[in-house]
Amino acid sequence: MHPKEIVRTGYNKIASRYTAKRVADSEDVQLLDLLVKRLPKQAMLLDAGCGSGYPITQFLEQFFRVTGVDFANQQLRLARTRLPGSTFVKADICRMPFKNDVFDAVCSYYAIIHVPRREQSRLLIDFLRILKMDGLALLCMGAGDIPDDTADYQGTEMFWSHYDKETNLRMVKESGFNILWSKVVKDPIDAHAAHLFVLGQKG
């Protein structure tokens, strides 16, 4: 099975269970204040790989006009039911149907790590394309070196792929972003995992 189909099938299977494990006061959610403090009210924001919309889209829509993108039907069904105030689009984040210079910010949590790492640079360049000048990107990336790998995740097969922290920071810069901030943060669900969060800016 293609890696993207593994991810799509897996998240469809565990949609409700995964959502139930997420919490609204974890450190990763608190990092969204990095966007709130820098963007005007009602800015246009893309949540790339939004899943069920909880808790990330739900937090963001208090401040911004949010469009969520995901390719897992069950996740989107939950998102549309929970959050009728936001717009949701079914699409692969590596092939998003948006024009250039549309969004004030892109937020992507726990999605880039499921994209084959050889494709991640192109994804970052596409994020840059759809951002307005000086637009922000808050990205969750890998903190350790994991070549394409599959393993059990909450009872289903899942795919991961990412570079180490320093390689990812270099990739963000080489994609055209200025790095404003970065930090490695523990996964709120898996105590053995940690992720690199990066705030980048177009310009």
Spans of features found by a protein language model:
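Conserved class I S-adenosyl-L-methionine
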Residues: 1-40, 145
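Class I SAM-dependent methyltransferase SAM/SAH-binding core
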Residues: 46, 52-95
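A short acidic, Gly/Pro-enriched loop at the edge of an enzyme's catalytic core
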Residues: 94-106
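A short glycine-rich, Lys/Arg-flanked "PGG" loop and its adjoining helix->strand segment in the class I
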Residues: 121-133
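Conserved beta-strand signature within the Rossmann-like core of class I S-adenosyl-L-methionine
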Residues: 134-141
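Short, glycine-/aromatic-enriched active-site segment of Class I SAM-dependent methyltransferases
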Residues: 142-159
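Short alpha-helix
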Residues: 160-176
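Core SAM-dependent methyltransferase catalytic element
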Residues: 188-203
